[in-house]
């Protein structure tokens, strides 16, 4: 007699409920949940995408060598730390910074800080160096440094003459003035912004003057072809310029956008073309080149421009994307634009970082992080401003060798230098005496509004701890 009920067989196994959540992530989208596509999270704080999985970011790391120098006031050899009062008085306050790549045989890369009366150089494996200014020269406000061949040029802004260092450790920093002026040339004027381009130094002076120096000589320019007036008489002010393609510069003014183009080495065919775009741009150091585009941050948010077409007589038309930051619009609305002049940007092989001030911050202590590999916003990063209150991004020093890899360093106005996305589990940005200044990293992830049938957004806070 057959049993009335057969045992449960493999074909009779009930189906398990299907998961409705995201199996992997591709970035951050802060719009309303119904607008967020699958694979995106509503918010990510201090997080990184690793093969579709969000993990806590690594921290700031200040190497011990970042506060070494070969001399302090009054120039005696020493091993310098934060507790050296003479060093702090003379060289802690920093007005600008960047990188000096020695073009000589050694090819060393140094982090450079601009202080009141000297340039301070630091790098791995060596005691740093201090290059003093010539007597009577000082820096007392925000400045920009650029390198053209072996020269470092310090742009002081306003009506102040720019400075330069010739690249030899025995030299001092001097004013950027010609020893003699060739016929048909003029001395370069004071500038608010500069860059090296096609063996020339390009300076933005006053409201309208785009000045291109002579080749190999940053002190003077051709008075006929080396200066062009950009949107003259319209009331807006020159802010920044970034190389675009092989023969053009994207010139950003406070309220207008232009393309300067010159194919001829002598600049005899130069032209300037105004682009049809509205903008309010007050953050010159956010203008950078990456992925064959120019990126910048203005009141509309992060925007990009690339060459759309080149017409007759080398007229350049741009393709402008003003929607880049639409997915992080809530963060853009929180930016403290009062401090826009302090904002900056940096590029690595994997990411683009925009340093800004949010909400009540008065210094750039927030990073908006764009992931170049997935072409999406990855996170916004902040650090503990209670424990690390004085650490903020004044300037970036990209591709600085440390522990056999190029690292992105940030330079703070208090003289601290730290590599980003390196130290595990905490931020370390310097020392008080011999005690490290540390702060834990808190990461928060908010989903796009539904997971496994739930209509509620979920927040997760976690700490990733690695024990060796």
State where each predicted segment sits.
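Intrinsically disordered, low-complexity linker/loop segments enriched in Gly/Pro
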Residues: 216-236, 258
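Asp-box/WD-like beta-propeller blade repeats and closely related beta-sheet repeat scaffolds
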Residues: 166-196
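Carboxylate/His-rich catalytic cores and anion/metal-binding grooves
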Residues: 189-217
């Amino acid at each position: 007699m057959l049993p009335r009920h057969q045992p449960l067989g493999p074909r009779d196994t009930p189906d398990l409920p299907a998961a409705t959540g995201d199996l992997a992530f591709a970035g951050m989208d802060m719009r309303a949940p119904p607008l967020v596509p699958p694979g995106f999270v509503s918010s990510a704080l201090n997080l990184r995408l690793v093969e579709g999985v969000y993990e806590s970011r690594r921290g700031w790391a200040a190497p011990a060598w970042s506060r070494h120098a070969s001399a302090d006031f009054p120039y005696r050899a020493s091993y310098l730390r934060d507790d050296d009062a003479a060093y702090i008085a003379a060289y802690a306050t920093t007005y600008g910074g960047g990188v000096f790549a020695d073009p000589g045989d050694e090819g060393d890369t140094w982090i450079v800080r601009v202080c009141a009366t000297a340039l301070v150089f630091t790098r791995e494996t060596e005691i740093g160096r201090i290059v003093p200014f010539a007597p009577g020269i000082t820096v007392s406000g925000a400045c920009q440094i650029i390198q053209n061949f072996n020269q470092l040029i310090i742009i002081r802004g306003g009506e102040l003459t720019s400075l330069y260092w010739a690249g030899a450790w025995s030299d001092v920093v001097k004013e950027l003035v010609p020893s003699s002026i060739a016929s048909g040339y003029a001395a370069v004027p004071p500038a608010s912004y500069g860059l090296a381009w096609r063996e020339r130094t390009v300076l933005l002076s006053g409201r309208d003057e785009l000045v291109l120096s002579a080749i190999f000589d940053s002190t003077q320019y051709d008075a006929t072809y080396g200066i062009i007036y950009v949107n003259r008489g319209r009331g807006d002010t020159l802010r920044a310029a970034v190389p675009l393609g092989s023969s053009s510069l994207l010139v950003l003014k406070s309220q207008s956008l232009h393309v300067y183009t010159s194919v001829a080495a002598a600049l005899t065919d130069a032209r300037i073309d105004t682009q049809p775009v509205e903008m309010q741009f007050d953050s010159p150091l956010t203008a950078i080149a990456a992925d064959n585009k120019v990126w910048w941050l203005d009141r509309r948010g992060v925007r990009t421009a690339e060459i759309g077409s080149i017409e007759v007589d080398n007229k350049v038309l741009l393709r402008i994307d003003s929607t880049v930051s639409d997915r992080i619009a809530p963060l853009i609305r929180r930016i403290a634009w009062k401090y826009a002049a302090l904002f900056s940007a940096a590029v690595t092989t994997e990411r683009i970082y925009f340093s800004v001030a949010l909400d009540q911050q008065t210094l750039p202590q927030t990073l908006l992080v764009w992931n170049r590999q997935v072409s999406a916003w990855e996170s916004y990063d902040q650090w503990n401003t209670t424990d690390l209150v004085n650490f903020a991004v004044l300037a970036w020093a990209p591709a600085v060798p440390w522990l056999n890899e190029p690292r992105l360093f940030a330079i703070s106005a208090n003289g601290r230098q730290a590599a980003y996305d390196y130290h595990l589990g905490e931020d370390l940005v310097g020392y008080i005496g011999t005690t490290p200044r540390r702060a834990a990293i808190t990461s928060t992830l908010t989903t796009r509004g539904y997971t496994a049938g739930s209509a509620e957004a979920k927040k997760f806070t976690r700490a990733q701890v690695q024990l060796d």
